[in-house]
Amino acid sequence: TGWIGGSDGTILKTSNTGSNWSPQTTNTTSPVYSLNFTNENTGWAVGYQGLIRYTTNGGTNWVNQTSPNSSWLYSVQFINSTTGYAAGTTGTILRTTNSGLNWLQQVTGIGDNMYGLHFPSPLTGYSVGTTGRIIKTTNGGLTIIEPIGNEVPADFSLKQNYPNPFNP
């Protein structure tokens, strides 16, 4: 099962690896930029001007959840059935710990648009944005670590490790 979002509130669902797509009723005309499902029934959609929609029946019905601001939301990821994150314009990172009943703004201290996020573990997460910006958290989004730099070294050198037992 898979879902895609698009303009005019479009959400499409496939149950046969993309051979056929069925439109879902979203009750919005706002663009949908990202979707994330924790199982085949429960998922979230985010998009234009703080759009957050939630389904518990595989996308048959979508209900509104309230965003704390009107930032455009470009990415959403839930790490379990209750804890999730959304990233958007002007450094917006939102966090919920109750399946989206309440979304709280996280302090990032940056103004760049954040276009993607990924949590490889419940506490460690990354978000990427404009100008190569990457930010990281190691405590589940409660605080953001100083943004990871985007500087590229001018040059580098690799020297022989002598004596090298693997390359006599």
Model-derived segments and spans:
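Residue-level detector of functionally pivotal "anchor" positions at catalytic/ligand-binding pockets or at interdomain
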Residues: N139-N161
